[in-house]
Amino acid sequence: MSMCMSLLYSCTTDKGLDKLAPAYQREQEVLDGMRTKLEAHQGYWRMAYYPDEHRSYGGYNIYVRFVKGRVEAITELDMNKDSSSYDLVSIDMPTLTFDTRNEVLHHFSTATEYFRNARGGDFELLIRGNQADTILLEGRKTHNQIRLEPINVEPSQEIASIQKVHQTLQGKGIQPMTIGSLSGVQIALYSTYRTMEFILPATGEDGKATSIKEAFHYTTNGIRFYEPVSIGGVRISALKLSEDASSLLDESNGLVFKLTTPILDFYRNKYAVKLAEGSASLQFYGSLRSVNKEMVRQYGEQLSTTMYLGSNTASDVEASLEGNDTSLATMLWHDLNDTKGKSVGRSLSYEMDFAAHGDNAQEINFFAIDGNESTFWYYYDRSVKPWINLFRRYSPYKVEKSTSDGVDTYRLTSTKDSRYWFDIKAL
């Protein structure tokens, strides 16, 4: 954008200032022009939306259509749709505001018991200018850049492709690789909160590795970073999923990010863990006893000794066990019992990502995400968070399979401390 980008004032000479219309009039002309542009497009606009000033939740595609002062919004998360009013006003500068409640547009700006300060979503978007047909916006609170691009297809078509890419990348590891002048770059993919982390090899006298994290949003054929990542003299803006879905490709730089498929698929399966002698190490079932002692003291309830890992099911959703952003999600959860070990009819769950560790399909990383609102995690957080931290601290885990009487059992042993292990079985 040039120095003459101002939406309210054109570049002019001092002699021409007296010919300018009053500021409020120029302001209104800008707002009216933007309203006309938004509503003149008969289809939807694709909005690449990043909540939170640190973009720690990644980016999301939201599809919006503007008609007669109302906006209809559809989210890529679950294709939910909602309609509400919108307005164009001047708050310091021209602003697109979603001024009445909309379940899609206010999803990340809604405070809950767990997300007490919401998740940093913006619903007042500063109008920064245009780039061809694209409208450039900026979140008032986060200052995140947001692009509004017109599309001429139904959102359902794009969303189907976006969700397919997302599902393909769930649980995938990425093999270490050379990027530009740096070799041995390790990469972690956080598929749920849409972030990629590049761990750079140790350099200098301190010998410490450094890392770069960058948020991205899914596209119809891959991912696009919020802003280009610079590594080893190379700038990476977007990655395309290869036709055989075995790699992510940076076609502009000729880079191939080879994907690793883990031996266990937590995104399509549900596994059970019996936290007791013989099926888990003392380090785990002993820690559960300590957590439960505190749970009983604080709440008169305790976690069941059976733990579940992986994806919840439709029947779990019916029992109010669901994710924060989508009904189905990957998580770690327990049934809640009373002091006598009888179920109280509720669960307690924490969302997690489970991904192959680098190029090793036999090792699984546990990435903690957030406690689930649906199971009132916020109420128990102080007592139970150490339990989640334990699994995260000793990740990744090496997977070893054994079969007895036709039943497969997988032993997961920490690669950091072999005293920490537990067995899981698919349900």
Predicted regions and their residues:
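C-terminal motif of bacterial Sec signal peptides marking the signal peptidase cleavage site
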Residues: 6-10
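Acidic/polar, low-complexity intrinsically disordered N-terminal segments immediately downstream
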Residues: 12-99, 103, 130, 144, ...
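Edge beta-strand at a domain terminus
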Residues: 13-26, 133-175, 251-287, 402-427
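N-terminal glycine/threonine-rich, aromatic-flanked beta-hairpin/loop signature
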Residues: 52-93, 183-221, 290-371
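Surface-exposed, polar helix/loop patches in the mature regions of secreted/periplasmic/lumenal proteins
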Residues: 88-132, 254-256, 262-271
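An anionic, turn-rich surface loop/hairpin at beta-sheet edges
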Residues: 97-120, 222-236, 363-395
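A charged, solvent-exposed segment within the mature domains of Sec-exported extracytoplasmic proteins
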Residues: 115-183, 297, 302, 376, ...
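Acidic, serine/threonine- and glycine-rich low-complexity intrinsically disordered segments
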Residues: 154-322
